[in-house]
Amino acid sequence: SNRFANYLLERGLQKGERVGLLLPNTAEFVIGYYGILKAGGVVMALNPAYTPTEVQTLAAESGIRLLVLAAHSYSRIASLRQSTPIERFIVVGEMEGELPDDDLSWAFLMENGNAEAVTTVQVEPDDPAVFQYSGGTTGTPKCAVGLHRNLVANVYQFRQWLVNTQEGRETVLVAIPCYHVYGMVLGMHLAIRLGARMVLISDPRDLDGLLDAIETYQASVFPGVPNIYAAINHYPSVLAGEHDLSSIRACISGSATLPMKVKHEFEALTHGHLVEGYGLSEAPTATHCNPILGENREGSIGLPLPGVTCRIVDLKTGTQEMPVGEAGELIIRGPQVMLGYHQKPEETAQTLREGWLYTGDVARMDEDGYFYLVDRKKDVIKVGGFQVWPSEVEAVIRQHPKVREVAV
């Protein structure tokens, strides 16, 4: 990462300037990510599956002049030099033929770069660290600006939550994409905070490879999404008892509701703990989680993480706090809440009000402080004068024994 950081500074990278990463979960992503931060830059991580048009839009909006990408992406992305601020591509992997003079091989940079520690840049807690492309709390695409202190605070919050882990003795399986703040914080950052071995999974859909990685490296911490845990539960070789998954101790599930059936089946397979949490790009990345060793309540996203304050407010004005048990919009205050949306002052003002992050999610809180998501505020279905939430319909359909997944 020092080599990459020094290269960026030699090319005139300015503090706060964005640098793009268009990579899957690979060592080059991790090295590039921390190199950008060391140089005082801002990471603009992009999904490698994005089309050239999508990359063009984001590159133009963020103003990135340099993009790191895999060799197999080069041919379809390189033409964007003509229509975006991108001046140079750094290519990871073997290329057919030679690169143009304007571009550079990652391998060459790693072999020949300056490995001295960066001492010329002072990075502050309130400096921007990441641009996370997000649908936002309103559904309109925008870039959430995460600060260094946001990311550090969140990984320390979650370190306190994982009471069954030990410094220097864990292996974190990073199967969530690192180009999303979920993978960044609860994958990369958490592994480093724990002093853990980091196992990067570039394609979690390859269950044979994923299961082999769990066994080979004795993965103990495994953040993921409900679909991946459900897929493991029903994979033929798992059902046949061909895998030893007993190393797994702590799993955090996000991005969608975790069915209790999936949770119980996975815990029976591994004898570890699988808990549901909640977060969003605007508070990179987690704000709630069920206790890893304490009580997990069905349908709940759990309790607020340390340092997080939450309220449930009325949907119309967002100013009146709702009684316990009644649904309203979930608003959050905490050290991980973003700076705002890049060049979107109106959307920022709508989402951040008097220090509170308005999530756009409808939720309720029970008498013990556990929170339950109802649905997205904008997804309400009005039927016969009543409000019906898609999640309520999904919950009923999910009860059928032959239904594995459902979306309304």
Predicted regions and their residues:
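Conserved adenylate-forming
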Residues: 11-13, 17, 113-127, 131-174, ...
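AMP-binding/adenylate-forming catalytic core of the ANL superfamily
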Residues: 50, 56-59, 67-69, 222, ...
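Conserved AMP-binding/adenylation subdomain of ANL enzymes
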Residues: 152-171, 181-220, 231, 235
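Gly/Ser/Thr-rich phosphate-binding loop
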Residues: 196, 219-224, 233-297, 309, ...
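AMP-binding/adenylate-forming core of the ANL superfamily
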Residues: 323-338, 356, 362-363
